[in-house]
């Protein structure tokens, strides 16, 4: 392999449910190997032997094309379906099998075999909390409805394109937390103080910081060669917003090198917010 060239490898996330569990765990593990270019295939709701055989054919085609064994992460409950998947020309990484058998030994009770149970709507209160939180995050994105801030669990603030929206959505979807977010504009920063609507909810504020170089790269994707994406503008905004965070005593986090999952976990740790689900 020539220097700087990425290794290519096909990856399959297979589930009899949404595949969210297999995908989440798989991505967390694959992130440890940045020198590999992963070709991701997501296969949810594989509940029949026929569907499994079709997947095996696709996996084998990838193996033949790539010349390497694909990686297969699965959360399949049905042993017959799983057995078919295991006949593929791949490295099969059953997410549940080893863990379930260990838990069965420790707990002294057999597991259920309900297909797709991981993300099923088995608890209506949890489901409602998740949906309500996601609706809240969408309705209160980017300073849209500040009159609802009294109902927020947390209000994320920071400059434009600092990661507020994806973090809000993840916190709401994964933990059922009601998150609003508000962009601190150049006008806000010129005044060097919090907008009145934020001061009224200061105890709910949490700041997101980002390195200037990273912010330039993100903004350039949106508005290349603009003042908005220039290094001087980004640096000015970030210095001003960090000054506000410090002077107002607002907790904040530099998210430049963090994934959304890491950002969300750190926010929970730093604020002591209690998750409603998960």
UniProtKB/Swiss-Prot annotation:
EC number(s) reported in the record: 2.7.11.33, 2.7.4.28
Binding site for ADP: 158-165
Annotated keywords: Kinase, Nucleotide-binding, Serine/threonine-protein kinase, Transferase
Domain of life: Bacteria
Catalytic activity: [pyruvate, water dikinase] + ADP = [pyruvate, water dikinase]-phosphate + AMP + H(+); [pyruvate, water dikinase]-phosphate + phosphate + H(+) = [pyruvate, water dikinase] + diphosphate
Keyword Transferase: yes
GO MF annotation, one: ADP binding
Pfam families linked to this entry: Kinase-PPPase
InterPro entries: Kinase-pyrophosphorylase, PSRP
Record carries keyword Iron-sulfur: no
Listed PANTHER family: PYRUVATE, PHOSPHATE DIKINASE REGULATORY PROTEIN 1, CHLOROPLASTIC
Role summary: Bifunctional serine/threonine kinase and phosphorylase involved in the regulation of the phosphoenolpyruvate synthase (PEPS) by catalyzing its phosphorylation/dephosphorylation.
Family, as annotated: Belongs to the pyruvate, phosphate/water dikinase regulatory protein family. PSRP subfamily.
Protein's recorded name: Putative phosphoenolpyruvate synthase regulatory protein
Origin organism lineage: Bacteria, Pseudomonadati, Pseudomonadota, Gammaproteobacteria, Moraxellales
């Amino acid at each position: 392999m020539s220097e700087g060239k990425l290794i290519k490898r096909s990856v399959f996330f297979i589930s009899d449910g949404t595949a969210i569990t297999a995908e989440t765990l798989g991505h967390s593990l694959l992130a440890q190997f940045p020198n590999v270019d992963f070709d991701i295939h997501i296969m949810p709701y594989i509940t029949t032997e026929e569907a499994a055989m079709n997947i095996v054919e696709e996996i084998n085609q990838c193996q033949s094309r790539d010349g390497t064994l694909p990686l297969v992460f699965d959360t399949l409950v049905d042993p017959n379906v799983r057995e078919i998947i295991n006949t593929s020309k791949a490295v099969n990484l059953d997410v549940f099998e080893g863990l379930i058998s260990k838990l069965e030994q420790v707990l002294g009770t057999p597991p259920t075999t309900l297909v797709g149970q991981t993300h099923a709507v088995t608890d209506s209160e949890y489901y409602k909390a998740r949906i309500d939180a996601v609706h809240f995050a969408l309705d209160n994105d980017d300073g849209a409805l500040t009159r609802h801030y009294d109902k927020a669990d947390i209000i994320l603030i920071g400059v434009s394109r600092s990661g507020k929206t994806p973090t809000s959505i993840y916190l709401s979807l994964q933990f059922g937390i009601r998150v609003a977010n508000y962009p601190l504009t150049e006008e806000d920063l010129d005044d060097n103080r919090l907008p009145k609507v934020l001061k009224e909810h200061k105890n709910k504020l949490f700041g997101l910081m980002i390195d200037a170089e990273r912010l330039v790269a993100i903004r350039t994707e949106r508005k290349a060669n603009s003042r908005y994406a220039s290094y001087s503008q980004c640096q000015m905004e970030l210095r001003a917003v960090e000054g506000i965070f410090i002077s107002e005593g607002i907790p904040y986090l530099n998210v430049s090198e963090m994934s959304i999952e890491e950002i969300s976990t750190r926010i929970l740790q730093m604020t002591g917010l209690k998750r409603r689900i998960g």
